[in-house]
A protein has these predicted regions:
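Conserved alpha/beta-hydrolase catalytic His-Asp/Glu region
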Residues: 24, 143, 160-217
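Catalytic active-site module of serine/aspartate enzymes centered on a nucleophile-bearing elbow/loop
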Residues: 247-277
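Gly/Ala-rich beta-loop-alpha elbow adjacent to hydrolase catalytic centers
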Residues: 110, 114, 118
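Flexible "cap/lid" loop of the alpha/beta hydrolase fold
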Residues: 119-123, 130-160
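Active-site loop/oxyanion-hole signature of alpha/beta-hydrolase fold enzymes
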Residues: 27-33, 56, 69-110, 269
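Short beta-strand/loop motif that positions the catalytic acidic residue
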Residues: 218, 224-226
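Conserved HGGG/HGGXW glycine-rich cap/lid loop of the alpha/beta-hydrolase fold
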Residues: 22-77
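Acidic catalytic loop of the alpha/beta-hydrolase fold
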Residues: 228-233
């Protein structure tokens, strides 16, 4: 089957930048209001996702803040080198990505794997981070779940049926996941080296240094957001992340693993309230 490489248009300019020798695609939202507001927010997607996964919350957030949203190396439409993906590799990539774009201070919103990356980055760069927002971050979970297993199956065998099944199980209310999200994932996982990058990243998270005892290094205000019915990374795994000093956990009712897709209005309201404090 042919791969549809059409990039969804969500009214944000697509940009390319070279980082560590790799071409990295990113979206950039900015306007006159956000130019006066010096706060930059960088959004980091989960494993197997892309910058476009955030499209449901960007129009509202971009009214107040400049947004930078990369396709993390190995994902989306960025380069997918056949290297060993480790958390150190991703942290170095993110540090150099920010340097290349001239971002010296930022707030970060990270989902799942992107939340884990944001956490690792912040532990070593707290002086650069104003606020940290983590939506069901990975890193604490060491045992797979049935929902994660289905997602892995969809990544390795990206048929429409497998992909739809995985996303319906990931969300609490299956109909909250748009068809575009399902087809975009399916198409991207058929791109060269996409499966390799996915599995190498999965192993990187599994083999990473544990978080316990290290989270106290984070000294920036932190918001944890979890879906009440998250079957991918269940709510129980939030306990380890609450070791972050000055952290707050907010539960979104009737929601699964992707609150910014399932409950974008509630997610945005929660985020904006936290950022404005």
């Amino acid at each position: 089957m042919d791969v549809d490489t059409h990039l969804p248009d969500y009214n944000a300019p697509m940009n390319l930048v070279e980082v560590n020798g790799y071409n990295i695609r990113f979206l950039h939202y900015s306007n006159k209001n956000t130019s006066r507001n010096k706060t930059t927010i960088v959004l980091l997607h989960g494993i197997g996702a892309s910058a476009d996964r955030w499209s449901y919350i960007c129009p509202a957030l971009s009214k107040y803040y400049q947004l930078i949203i990369p396709d993390i190396v190995g994902f989306g439409y960025s380069d997918k080198p056949t290297v060993e993906y480790t958390m150190d590799f991703f942290v170095r990539f993110f540090e150099n990505f920010l340097t290349k774009l001239g971002v010296e201070r930022l707030s970060i919103i990270g989902s799942s794997f992107g939340g884990f990356l944001a956490t690792e980055f912040t532990m070593g760069n707290s002086e650069k981070v104003d606020k940290l927002i983590l939506a069901a971050p990975a890193g604490a979970m060491r045992i797979s779940t049935r929902t994660l297993d289905q997602y892995i199956m969809a990544a390795l065998y990206p048929t429409y049926e497998n992909t739809k099944r995985a996303f319906r199980d990931m969300a609490h209310e299956p109909n909250t996941v748009p068809e575009d999200t399902i087809r975009d994932f399916m198409n991207r996982m058929r791109l060269p080296n996409a499966k390799y990058a996915f599995m190498s990243t999965l192993l990187a998270m599994r083999d990473s240094q544990g978080l316990s005892g290290r989270l106290s290094k984070i000294n920036v205000p932190t918001l944890l957001i979890w879906g009440e019915y998250d079957r991918m990374i269940p709510l129980a795994y939030s306990k380890e992340y609450t070791e972050i000093p000055n952290s707050k956990l907010v539960l979104i009712n009737n929601c699964g693993h992707i609150p910014f897709v399932e409950k974008p209005l509630e997610f945005n309201n929660t985020v904006l309230k936290f950022l404005r404090v």
